[in-house]
């Protein structure tokens, strides 16, 4: 009996640990917690608005996700985020959205979302998409068309590119965090402020110092 009890206790501890590991955002402990953006309280997320002051408008956002965005930039893409910063009703719900517009041959460059898995749906056009795993860095990529869905696992480097030379493309992403965050690899490495030592980058990328200096001198434009 004692051994059975110990086995059960061990199994419960493993299950509890597993649940803690796989959880991205903390699970809500109440029906909702609309973010109070003016609260002086600092927590992991946002303090709750008084439930008595919450209305239907707190769960609505006129995002205009049906409207094309301006893709006139070096990357030829535009990401419109709808996370807790724009939509306080998402607080504690563990979800956010993004609309991604691509100019012909536009690219959403390699980046990561440190706090979220991303589920991308192609609304218009044809995209080349992919992600790279942790070491030894295997690439999983595919050409996806209108109506197709592709998932990028949490914190993996991933990208999308519009393959059409003449037509724009549009996608929409659901992300498993109210605030997924984004780190664009190229601009993070070569455009950080203050800059990373060129000695570090020269050795890391195994190229000449003048190439690193040139890369660091560029204007690294974002698409969001």
Swiss-Prot record:
Member of the 12 germin-like protein gene cluster located on chromosome 8 in the major-effect quantitative trait loci (QTL) for fungal blast resistance. Partial suppression of the 12 germin-like protein genes increases susceptibility to the fungal pathogens causing rice blast and sheath blight diseases. It is found in: Secreted, Extracellular space, Apoplast. This is Germin-like protein 8-12. It holds the Pfam family Cupin_1. Residues 1-23 form the signal peptide. Plays a role in broad-spectrum disease resistance. Probably has no oxalate oxidase activity even if the active site is conserved. The keyword Metal-binding applies. Glycans are attached at residue 78. One of its GO terms (cellular component) is apoplast. PROSITE patterns: GERMIN. Mn(2+) binds at residues 111, 113, 118, 158. Its main location: secreted. Keywords: Apoplast, Disulfide bond, Glycoprotein, Manganese, Metal-binding, Secreted, Signal. It comes from the Eukaryota. The keyword Ribosomal protein does not apply. Residues 60-213 form the Cupin type-1 domain. SMART domains: Cupin_1.
